[in-house]
Each structure stands twice: as C-alpha cells, then as structure tokens.
Amino acid sequence: MFGKGGMGNLMKQAQQMQEKMQRMQEEIAQLEVTGESGAGLVKVTINGAHNCRRVEVDPSLLEDDKDMLEDLIAAAFNDAARRIAETQKEKMAAVSSGMQLPPGFKMPF
C-alpha cells in the first residue's frame, strides 16, 4: 500500500511538515501588515495574530463626518486582515510544497 519504506517516510514527512508549520506560524505571528482606505488617509497596522498595532488618521479627516471616519477605519482594518490572511496562505502553502500528499488532500489552512 505504501511501498518500500513508505509508511516510515510518510511519518517522517508529517513530522517535518509539522515542525515547518510551527516555525511558519511563529513567523507569521511576528509579521505586521498595513491596510489602507480613503486613498491612504486612514491606515491600520495589524500583526499576524490579527491584533491591531497602530491606527493612523490623516489630520484632514478629523474635521469631517464622524461616521465616514469610522467607516474608513473599519475598511482599513478589513484591508489589513485580508492582507495578513493572503500572506498566511502563501507562507503555509510554501511549507506543504514538495510534500508527497495524496490527491485531493486538503491542508488545514
């Protein structure tokens, strides 16, 4: 079923992948990305754990409509969350490349 040494190799690959994923998750947690809205007038920086690290608002917006500013902050946060999710997906895909996984096997990320 697994061929010569197949089961042992499969277990070794699984352990290596688990170690790589652990390192990658630690690396991702340290990443910071910045999302923007309003053509860069509002910027939100989050880390890989989706914790907000910084919010920057252009002073010209402080005189405008409060509701609009709130919407821009939310949009900037959502942009940052999307960017970190894309980065996580790319980095985790790199971990699984080269693995001899069965066809149709879905990784948990």
Curated annotation (Swiss-Prot):
Its main location: cytoplasm. Pfam families: YbaB_DNA_bd. This is Nucleoid-associated protein SG0690. Residues 1-23 are annotated as: Disordered. Binds to DNA and alters its conformation. May be involved in regulation of gene expression, nucleoid organization and DNA protection. Homodimer. GO terms for molecular function: DNA binding. Gene3D superfamilies: Nucleoid-associated protein YbaB-like domain. GO terms for cellular component: bacterial nucleoid; cytosol. It is found in: Cytoplasm, Nucleoid. NCBIfam families: DNA_YbaB_EbfC (TIGR00103). Belongs to the YbaB/EbfC family. It comes from Sodalis glossinidius (strain morsitans). Keywords: Cytoplasm, DNA-binding. InterPro entries: YbaB-like_sf, YbaB/EbfC.
